[in-house]
Curated annotation (Swiss-Prot):
GO terms for cellular component: membrane. It comes from Caenorhabditis elegans. GO terms for molecular function: phospholipase D activity. The lineage of its organism: Eukaryota, Metazoa, Ecdysozoa, Nematoda, Chromadorea. The chain crosses the membrane at residues 124-144. Residues 145-554 are extracellular. This is Probable phospholipase D F09G2.8.
């Protein structure tokens, strides 16, 4: 007995227009005809049976090589029939229409199906609609969470301009080193050229004093900030709120005179310990400074500092602005760290995906790293991870200049612990054949335990594997000491306060000392650039200091 297609839809069909009923009749008849042919071909030897041709719409249905019917024409005819079916001209139609685009027919099929036993489609519409709305909300609602990042100027991620950069330094009075770009002059230039906005992240304030002759640079910078506020530049300052290193009278005066808005970030309240150790200036979301210098006159004339300036570079400035915006948000009263930072705070730029730009006429790549982890939205490279990856990427040379180097935490009281993350990366680099040179500061406040840790790094050289019989990695350590400035003794001065690293490919300039606390619970940032010219400039500074009379073997 021939197989017959059971039309379940016909048993539960809603009331339909004649055109739709006719469509179902056509489809049913054609399916029955096709199945009869399938059954005949299935149970008979196709090689012994004469070829039979089935006509559909007066066209022959072809067969495949094994005698089965070719479905192509049938499916296309069925599709064509479903798209256009005859209609009654008495009802105002032109003789052909598509029930799938007939709004009235759709309503009848989906919403008015007669008595309850015929309601097939309507109940399904409800859960499908709910699921669809849920998916839409899940995917698109986060995209509307942009109001949390208030930006006075449209941020950009595309670097279409040639960014000008300057390596800037503070050279303590009495050191014979020369620099083309002094930190104080760079700051004053940035501030004086600000037209609308000036955002500053600072640990503490100590610019405006006349107690010492060398404090003139500090006063000049502070006067530049006052001038900017008076000419209408909107100044915002995000400063540490828990360290008690200064009474911050200078920022308080700016607020009192209506020249600036200040917010304090209490890192200890937010994550249990830590401070804002970041130092950067951002002008008009276009020009910026990142470096080791504090807003302290000593950092401009009595302490050795290193930083970098990006001039008229909106893409880099926009990325730094997101970090400032996070600080600004955390400076609100009763603020909490978001469980998940809004999308608008995210960055696409990190070690795995550096931003491409033109820097001083040459191709370059960059990203900005930050710590601690809870302050970082998605995409932002943690400062520690940046250091580790840069060392892992090095093939020939790693040169490090930092004030403090201790593989432990220092400020967690009874909870201090061994912290070997950077120490292990240094050893790993040397083991792979990289020449590691470390220039560490020595001054009145250096910790005694630092020297044994440095010696332990240096002594591994003799145990490192040799490559090509003669070549092998090594760790060399030198101590850099800034001599006193005559008879004048100024507290917390005469030290190399720089925090940078340079390899054969990458220049890293940061704001953090190299001990555990600065990456676990202290806020800091770093600029990372991959460009031959940038690395050469920073390498020249390192080599100058390394080979100077102020550098001694450990």
């Amino acid at each position: 007995m021939p197989l017959r297609l059971i039309n379940f839809r016909q048993q539960r069909r809603c009331r339909q227009s004649p055109s739709v009923a006719r469509l179902e009749s056509i489809v049913l008849n054609r399916r029955e005809l096709l199945l009869d042919h399938f059954q005949y071909s299935l149970f008979q030897n196709s090689s012994e049976i004469p070829m039979t041709t089935i006509l559909i719409n007066d066209r022959p249905m072809r067969h495949t090589h094994d005698g089965r019917a070719d479905m192509t024409n049938f499916e296309m005819d069925l599709f064509d029939t479903r798209i256009e079916v005859p209609t009654s001209k008495n009802s105002g139609g032109d003789g052909m229409h598509s029930p799938y685009y007939d709004e009235e027919s759709s309503k009848k099929r989906c919403c008015k199906c007669g008595n309850s036993r015929n309601r097939i489609i309507k109940p399904a519409c409800v859960p499908i609609s709910i699921v669809s709305l849920f998916i839409i909300a899940l995917v698109f609602l986060p995209l509307f969470n942009e109001e949390d990042l208030a930006s006075p100027i449209k941020l950009t991620t595309g670097c279409s301009v040639d960014c000008k950069t300057f390596l800037v330094e503070s050279i303590p009075i009495g050191l014979p080193f020369k620099t083309n770009n002094h930190t104080a002059e760079a700051w004053i230039n940035i501030i004086d050229n600000s037209k609308q906005y000036l955002d500053i992240s600072v640990m503490y304030w100590n610019l405006n004093t006349s107690d010492y002759k060398s404090s003139v640079y500090g006063r000049r910078v502070y006067e530049a900030i006052i001038r900017a506020g008076k000419r209408g530049v909107k100044i915002r300052i995000a400063q540490d709120g828990a360290s008690n290193l200064s009474d911050n009278k200078e920022s308080a005066y700016l607020v009192q005179e209506g020249l600036a808005e200040v917010r304090e970030i209490n890192v200890t309240r937010l994550i249990g310990s830590g401070i804002i150790h970041t130092k950067f200036i951002l002008s008009d979301i276009a020009t910026l400074y990142i470096g080791s210098a504090n807003m302290d006159w000593k950092s401009l004339s009595e302490v050795k500092e290193v930083g970098v300036v990006f001039q008229e570079c909106p893409c880099v400035a926009s990325d730094l602005y997101k970090i400032f915006a996070a600080y600004w948000k955390l400076g609100e009263n009763d603020s909490v760290i978001p469980e998940k930072w809004p999308i608008s705070y995210r960055t696409p730029f990190n070690f795995s995906s550096m931003a491409k730009l033109t820097m001083d006429g040459e191709p370059a790549e960059y990203f900005i790293s930050s710590s601690p982890g809870p302050f970082n939205p998605k995409g932002r490279e943690h400062d520690l991870a940046a250091i580790q990856k840069i060392m892992k990427d090095a093939r020939k040379s790693v040169c490090i200049s930092v004030m403090d180097y201790i593989p432990s935490t220092l400020y967690m009281k009874k909870s201090n612990r061994f912290w070997p993350e950077i120490d292990d990366s240094i050893r790993d680099a040397a083991y792979r054949g990289v020449n590691v040179r470390m220039l560490i500061s020595h001054w009145d406040h250096s910790r005694k335990e630092m020297i044994p840790f440095l010696k332990s790094l240096q002594t591994i050289t003799d145990g490192l594997p040799r490559y090509n019989r003669t070549e092998h990695g090594q760790v060399q350590v030198r101590i850099f000491t800034v001599p006193p400035n005559g008879k004048e003794k100024i507290p917390f001065t005469r030290v190399n306060h720089a925090k940078y690293m340079v390899t054969e490919d990458i220049a890293y300039i940061g704001t953090s000392n190299w001990s555990g606390d600065y990456f676990i619970s202290t806020a800091g940032v770093a600029m990372v650039v991959r460009q031959p010219s940038a690395t050469k400039r920073l390498q020249n500074v390192f080599d100058r200091d390394w080979n100077s009379e102020y550098s001694k073997d450990l």
